Amino acid sequence: MSNKTMVAVAAALVVAAYGGGTWYSGEQVHKSFQEAAAELRHAVGEDAVVRDSYEKGFFSSNANLVLEWTPDAPQVPVEEHDGDEVEPASAAAVTPLKPMRLVMNSDIRHGPLAGAKLAAAVVDSRFALEGIDDKTKQAFAKASMPTLTVVRHLMGSSDWRFALPAGEFADDGVAARWADMAYDVVVGSDKKSVTGDFKWPELVITGLPKSSADDYADEDQEDEDGEEAPAPVRASKGEQMAIAVKGMGGSFNTTMIEGLWGVGPGKMQMRVANAQVTTQQADGPPEVVVDLKDITGDTKMEADAKTLSISNHINGVGRIGPLEFESLGYEEKIQRLDIEVLRSLQQMVLEGYRAGGLSQALAPAEDQLAEWMERSGPKLLQALPSYNMKLNAHYQGSAGHLEYGFGVLKAPSAEEVAEKGWMPVLLKGSVLNASARLPKAWMVNIAKASGQELGPEELDAMIQMASSSGYARVDGDFLTADLKVQDGQMNLNGVVKPLPMGLGR
């Protein structure tokens, strides 16, 4: 066989192999799309996915996925006349909201060198919202939809990059602007191991109304003598709040638990260069009320065959109100959460979404929540869960802390719950701890930060009152307090006291 013939045969084999690899890659991507669409239908309901089409080609394909939902209608207040509820005329005039659609178009290149990369396929997805009104379009006129790029490797792993371009939002005096955000994720070939990182240099929101829900006190409030209370004092008109977060970033790695979406053992680290909250009166200068810097945090999840435990740590420095802290710390531990109970909780949320949209998913009906608690509560307690939280700070050269925790030591039986109720049996079989240690020198500035001026004599009187009543102890330059509730008894600073009426019975 001549050299030319050998070269031709080799070239033909390469072309055949590449063509076969391209066809196989296309088949695998098509199969993955069908599986993802089926999982999505299962999660959000058959009616929510109105289209999932796939046009397959040899070197490239196109996929189209469309989700549809109808936004929740605004709540119309019900008027009362002489104690009878009357539906206002405006309720009948409420226009039914039109369905909205989220459209995802994906261009897919497949083959051993898809997209000039050694990969089985490269998927570029673009998103669009349909059905939004003109007001919403105008509010997001300077914003772009995110993009998603997925690289599927030959051995089954994949790289995901979610990118949100820089943009702006403005509506009814509230405005926001943000820098480019990027989220990079690597999913292992087992579809369980996930690693990733994200970067978001800046997010600023301005014009938020401050305390709008508390502008008016209850006008029907009566004083202790049964007389109508004085006219309520309205909060400052035009007071607004702004939030600015800069230098956000982080990374994570986890191994997903079967049947538990987005949760599994692993670690996450995050950082924020600066977080600032500013308030401003209508005609006054802005006032910085929170200014925290060098914020770092980490989360660790651990799991065994039946339970999941979570620990969080956050640290930073900066100012809250007039108090300039040398350091601030937050620690949290949630231990022994039953995995089956978490699965059932996620299932309840999904069922709520299918039945009534996002609002019902986030706030399930009272009877639905009660049924879930009755079914899952005993199993949750059998794992003996616990929760602990600690706040610590350094201020003016001194350290102080606040902490509390709760843990189940003995799971109650169904008979005990039926006889005495949840609260008494929980108190009998659980332990509650709380403690505080604060420098006395902090009290003046803490009171000032809350709008009260305390002189030395007033401070001494306040400390003496707290000490003589048994609620606090004086330990040199510190005020301390310790509380423990266990076996149906309350121990406050070493003194056993009866539980509040009704809790222990």
Regions found by a protein language model. Name each.
Residues 7-9, 17-505:
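Glycine-rich, small/hydroxylated-residue low-complexity segments
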Residues 1-6:
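Positively charged n-region of N-terminal signal peptides that target proteins for export
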